[in-house]
């Protein structure tokens, strides 16, 4: 009995026993849902609508295809009337198999809404008046954010307790 225990101990120390088995790494591509993508819309020109499609940052083998453009994980494309209202998401598994999902989305309604909202608030198409307003607003917001950061850094430096080594040694 003692000899068997010695042999098992030596096998486990040498890595030949079952005590040294490593669990398989979890592949995020196995759980990836090709239909769970994020779409963002913005006016690109007076007629085109910019579309940003993001899918699966955890899985590197995701390919998105729309209007003959293919890219990994994020695809920036444009939509206009006549362009297909679907995009394809394909995920390559660890065994080489490919899962494909053809997603149909209401590009026309979302782009119409984005264009309508930008036109309603005179944000699109750009004009001299709103470009100047945007530039001034951008400069003001940048100055405010910079001031907030400077105040925070100043407060961090001023409020931080300054204890010398002698004071630390006197503490109980």
Curated annotation (Swiss-Prot):
Q: What does this protein do?
A: Binds and retains class I heavy chains in the endoplasmic reticulum during the early period of virus infection, thereby impairing their transport to the cell surface. Also delays the expression of class I alleles that it cannot affect by direct retention. Binds transporters associated with antigen processing (TAP) and acts as a tapasin inhibitor, preventing class I/TAP association. In consequence, infected cells are masked for immune recognition by cytotoxic T-lymphocytes.
* Spans within the Cytoplasmic topological domain: 158-172
* Species of origin: Human adenovirus B serotype 3
Is Disulfide bond there in the keyword field?
yes
Which cysteine pairs are covalently linked by disulfides here? 37-55, 49-111
Q: Which residues are glycosylated?
A: 36, 68, 72, 102
Tell whether ATP-binding is among the UniProt keywords: no
| UniProt name for this protein | Early E3 18.5 kDa glycoprotein
Q: Which InterPro entries match?
A: Adenovirus_Gp19K (IPR006965), Adenovirus_Gp19K_sf (IPR038710)
Q: How is it modified after translation?
A: Both disulfide bonds are absolutely critical for the interaction with MHC antigens.
Cellular location(s): Host endoplasmic reticulum membrane
Q: Which GO terms describe its molecular function?
A: D-mannose binding
Q: What UniProt keywords are attached to this protein's entry?
A: Disulfide bond, Early protein, Glycoprotein, Host endoplasmic reticulum, Host membrane, Host-virus interaction, Inhibition of host adaptive immune response by virus, Inhibition of host tapasin by virus, Lectin, Mannose-binding, Membrane, Signal, Transmembrane, Transmembrane helix, Viral immunoevasion
Q: Which Gene3D superfamilies match?
A: 2.60.40.3530
